Every structure is written in C-alpha cells, then in structure tokens.
Amino acid sequence: MKEKLEKLQEVIGYQFRDPGLLTHALTHSSYANEKHWDKTRCNERLEFLGDAVLEVISSDFLFHTYESMPEGEMTKLRASLVCEPTLAYCADVIPLGDYLLLGKGEDLTGGRKRPSVVSDAMEAVIGAIYLDGGLANAKEFIHRFILNDIEHKQLFYDSKTILQEMVQAKYKETLVYELIKEEGPDHNKSFEVCVKIGDEEIGRGLGRTKKAAEQVAAYHGICKIQYGTDHVVLRNRKINACI
C-alpha cells in the first residue's frame, strides 16, 4: 500500500506530510465495515469537508474568471463542474478508483468504477489535502483536476441536449435510449443504457439512475459522431457517471 500511496501522490502532484490522511481519504465505508472499524475511520467525514472546500474554490474561480456572467449562470456552471457525474469523470483521469480501499463485496461488484464511490473519494482527497496542506494546496489540486478544461466538462454535462440537436440536424432516424441492464439493491442501483440512432448503437453509459446512464451514453454518442470513437474524453479515459 505504501508504494501505491507514493505513486498516487506523484500523480496528483501533492506530497502529504501526514500520509495517514490520504489513506483515510481512500478508505471506503465497506472496507471499514469489513474490518469492524469505527465509522469515523472511513472517508465520509473527509468527503463532507472536501465538498465544502470544493464549493468555495469553484465559486471563487467562477466569480473571478467570468466577470460578466450573471449569478444564475454561475450557479448552473458551478453545478456542472462539481456534481457527482463530473467528479467521477475527473477521478477517472487519475484514476482514483485504482487506489481505493474497498470491502471485498464492493470491489467484486465494480466499486472501483462506481461513480458514487469515486466521486465521494475525490471530495475526500480534497478534504485531506486541505487538512494536511491548507487551502492553497487544495486549490491547486482542484484547479488541476476539476476546474481545467471547462468547455469539455460542459459538453459532458449537457450531452443529452447536444446529442439531440446533432441528430436532428444530421440524421433522419430517431434518437432512442434503451435500458440494457439494471442491477443492485434499491439503495444502490446500477443502470446500463445504450443510445441508438435508428438501429445503430452509438454509445453506452453506466449510472446510479437511468437519467445518469443516458447522460454518459449521450456523451459517448457525441464522441462517436464527431471523432469516430465512443470514448474520446479528457486524456482518453472512459467515463461513467451518476446523478
């Protein structure tokens, strides 16, 4: 685990003075439960803190970057940048899921790629960096991995609307979303959806809701139409999401 932590710190560009904070941020509740640890030893409290830090930093960034943007538009843009789907997208760039401490069941059922798990861990890492190195270091991490390439993230966030407009302009066939698979208990559902133009599949997506899975499928569909492949994303990594 020590080697993995060192590698992760190289990837994110921050060296922890207290590596235990990073381990804490990577500890999912399923792992803590499996070890019969106290609930405070999982990453949920750090996630809570990181969420607050992320909101402050992203708000400050938008306020100073888009000086003529009205409050309502800034609110919408911030929501698109810090929502669970986008955070899962950003976490996959690292890829953060590879470093998580998960319970065996969570790991076997795809927890390392589950959007809710990796997006929560992303916020927990922000919280850990804030505690270890202060607001400036947390800000640097957020700018590097979340507030970069905003236009691309906006495309992801608005993918269903954009794909609909593209298909209406270029094709005669109807755009259709089909549910491929639904699994998991009611409190932790997972959906897989494909999107088709007529009978031709152009993208697939996973998510905790059908709407979220459709969003990811639409994004992959846009990439397929524009670039001929369904996974042209930031740093060429596939994404999954949920909202």
Label for each model-derived stretch:
Residues M1-I243:
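Double-stranded RNA-binding/processing signature
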